[in-house]
Amino acid sequence: MEREKFQQKALKQTKQKKSKSAEFLMVKEDREATEGTGNPAFNMSSPDLSACQTAEKKVIRHDMPDRTLAAHQQKFRLPASAEPKGNEYGRNYFDPLMDEEINPRQCATEVSREDDDRIFYNRLTKLFDESRQGEPQDESGREETLNSEAPGSSNKSHEIHKEASEATTAHLEEFQRSQKTIILLGSSPLEQEIRSTSLHCMEDEMSHPWILLLKVTAVIRSRRYYREQRF
């Protein structure tokens, strides 16, 4: 009996303790709900609320970028954008280069090569025209012209022929060097052999000046056409 009484008494004490702790917690929650837990955001009468809100707004504005196009343009607007620059993006890739983009060294070398080729071409055409005009129809006419020619004119024509032959050989040597250094990609050994035989035939044609003259003029014309198409 005493044991049962002791157990009942212990149960009552635990129930009282639980009820007291529950009442204490409920009172504390009600007090926090009415007064706030020290956070100025829950207390509308606190003077720190406006300062906290402005600080949060500043932080948010600093962290988040502006989404509008006007703000983006104002941020990244350059000071020199007001100066007229013209239609920069309207220029095509294949348009001729501007003055500031041209390399003066490359331009000078190309101009000098064009001048040399033009002078050489004019000399060859002049020599070719003179030879065609002065060539007789038969051997009798050739003998008469040779007998009637003065020594001064013969010397002059000999100098012109010599100068043209020297220029022709110089251009031919340069052309042969450039052709020998070229290696065609994907070319078979047969094609390379054909190319080497064509170079040997060109060397053999050195003894025939008119064939050589025609070939050199064709090369110069092709180079001039390529440059005109390029620029």
UniProtKB/Swiss-Prot annotation:
Residues 127-145, 156-166 have a biased composition (Basic and acidic residues). The keyword Protein transport does not apply. Residues 36-48 have a biased composition (Polar residues). Keywords: Chromosomal rearrangement, Methylation. The modification Omega-N-methylarginine is found at residue 113. InterPro entries: OFCC1. Residues 1-24, 29-48, 127-166 are annotated as: Disordered. It is linked to A chromosomal aberration involving OFCC1 is found in patients with orofacial cleft. PANTHER family: OROFACIAL CLEFT 1 CANDIDATE GENE 1 PROTEIN. This is Orofacial cleft 1 candidate gene 1 protein. The lineage of its organism: Eukaryota, Metazoa, Chordata, Craniata, Vertebrata.
